[in-house]
Amino acid sequence: MTRGPASETQTPTPTPLWAAAQSRRWQSSVTAAVCSVLCVVLGACSKHAPESGSGGGETQPNRLTVSPASSQASTSAGEATRPVAAERAPIVDPIPPHTVPALTAREKVGQSIFLDTTLSNPPGTSCASCHDPDTAFSGNNGSASGVARGSRPGHFARRNAPSVMYVKFVPPFHFALEDDDDVAESPFGGLTWSGRADTVAEFARLPLFDADEMNNASEAEVARKLRGSPYAADLAREFPGALETPAASMKALGEALQVFLTSDTMSPFTSKFDDFLRGKARLSPLEMKGLTAFENRAKGACNHCHQMYPHSNRPESSLFTTYAYDAVGVPRNRAIAANADPERYDLGLCERKQKAGRPLDSSDPKWCGSFRIPSLRNVAVRQRFMHNGVFTKLRDVVAFYATRSTNPDLWYPHGARFDDVPDRYRSNVNTLSFPYNRRERDPPALDDADIDAIVAFLQTLTDEPYRSRIALAAAHTASNETTP
């Protein structure tokens, strides 16, 4: 994986090999208006009361105050700000009108399975419990520790549950050249933080049989629950043979969930940024400043990993991820009960089981500490961030990236940098790419104003029906900050 400083001559970001092939398969028009369909999900989703105890207090870094002097860091002529789109993106070709697709019969079956709280042991936990429609299909089933709570008391998954919106675009796990000048291939894609599943159907099975998640003992147990469900007849009609054997039931369950999770409902492209790309909305000056900092390699350099194309009027070209892997050295989440064991680490990609027939091995120690780069779409709606859920505020995430190298004491209070990676693998952590390549006590690449601007820009990636909620939250925050 290329981790050296990029050339200061600004050129378009190379498209990974998988993306070139995938782009040909994208539909020319993607349904945008999702509100009415999501309301069905929002209304049907069961809610779970937060757990009474978290097993320890959460580490929540305070709002950073980076010295104003940091904004005076010298910038060479070669580090000039990369030009970004104007306030209104040009329309290259006609944009089809938005429509609201009704879920098909097959998609409705998948939705019913997704919401079914009887599919866990003991009952009470559904897919939607950890991938809550109310928080852009992310969340942790009421857990206060940053990782998903399982169906059994005291049991927790290893990681923060990611959003399952836009999963239709995630390619299967594979190795490819990340940049045109690379010699060695790097890992891309796969569902989950470590790419354990190649398809949504395969991904959907994982929590069902995890003892710390939905805790089913066998396919026969799940098949019995499906046969007794209120949607059993619909499942059998839409997926013939689904109830005949446990294996057939599991196959149908995976297919039904895949049909639902890859529907247009789950990839709506209804954010303000999407309207901006279509030429139907303007970004505010603060949001434009954030977009500029997001792209500028002398500032955030976020676009290198969270790829987007502000000059394209097609939102589906801006998924805000390359689906590559990176080791960023996030702080250890000490609110996770299992982390009380100092020898317990989540090694990420290198723990992934190698599948037969694949020439390159993801278990190579150089990938220890690496996790798949998530999409930033709807990131402002999420309640937990990073694979271990250590951050609860989006602003802290941006500040971490900006100051991890320059002010490590803000993030690693116990002295050791990269304290959630074993000593022997800490050299894997990315210290070469912008903005990680600054020395300790150097001025950070981003000052407070830059961080606020990037957060404002990231809020424009919020789809309906979440947009109004983000706007209300921002207004509430502004009101509190101006009140004497």
Regions found by a protein language model. Name each.
Residues E8, T15-L17, A33, G56-Q60, ...:
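Intrinsically disordered low-complexity regions specifically enriched for long asparagine
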Residues T2-R3, C45-P484:
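Periplasmic c-type cytochrome electron-transfer domains
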Residues T31-G43:
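Bacterial N-terminal signal peptides
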